[in-house]
Amino acid sequence: MIKARFKKRLLGSRGAFDLNINLEIKEAEVVALLGESGAGKSTILRILAGLEAVDSGYIEVNHSVWLDTQKKIFLKPQQRKIGFVFQDYTLFPHLNVYQNIAFAHPKDKNKIHKVLGLMRLENLSQQKILKLSGGQAQRVALARALIAAKNLLLLDEPLNALDNALKNEVQQGLLDFIKRENLSVLLVSHNPNEITKLAQTSLFLNNGVIDPNQENLPFLNCLLIKPLFEDENYCHYEVIPQTISLPKDCLNPTFKLDFS
């Protein structure tokens, strides 16, 4: 169980605002954190990882206190044993795929090989990072995060470089791993299908706080778009309360919805 309450003053594109967060994540639960760009979602991940300071606050993970500003407690990032997938991956370019994944726990070879298989990286284990595609590098970053995570997994747009077929495989493997390892997960993503597939709970960050009236927000209604089925020529999507059909050669449809 993750319990976090903290405050931090941020400077965004629209000026300064206060981040005032009260968050709980259960074991083996994936929580999606939604919100506009610049709302502070990535900052929250970095605070939980110990990579950014807060003005005041408290973080507890499985009854262990990671942060308490009143008691001047601060657990260093390397002591938190979390997995973190950054948007820029932050891999070691001079190491190969296996060495990057094994960096946190080099002796746990059985787990390393399982994660290599989970991320479809078996045939790339000796490849240097600089020779990988964007999607391959992203899978390496995710695999390394899974090896490192003991309690908490932080995912910042973790699958946005993958094609749809591979993404579906990786998503299911990721869910199985999270359940098996009892990880608490905080996911930041702008992909509605990804959120629907991975997350049990969705929270909306609005004006520096997690909005208590999420069900009334137009942004969340975008999650009601989901693929239904395909036939010979068309892909069919459900957009509550109606169904629309698009030509199958429309590979990445963009929906403009009016909720007024």
Predicted regions span which residues?
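Catalytic Walker B motif of ABC-type/P-loop ATPase nucleotide-binding domains
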Residues: L153-E157
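Conserved ABC ATPase signature
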Residues: K128-L132, Q136-Q138
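Hydrophobic anchor residue at the start of the ABC signature
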Residues: L142
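A short, proline-enriched helix->beta-strand linker immediately N-terminal to the Walker B motif
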Residues: I147-N151
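Conserved H-loop
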Residues: N182-V188
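Conserved ABC ATPase "signature" region
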Residues: S64-T69, K109-S125, D176
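ABC ATPase NBD coupling module
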Residues: W66-F84
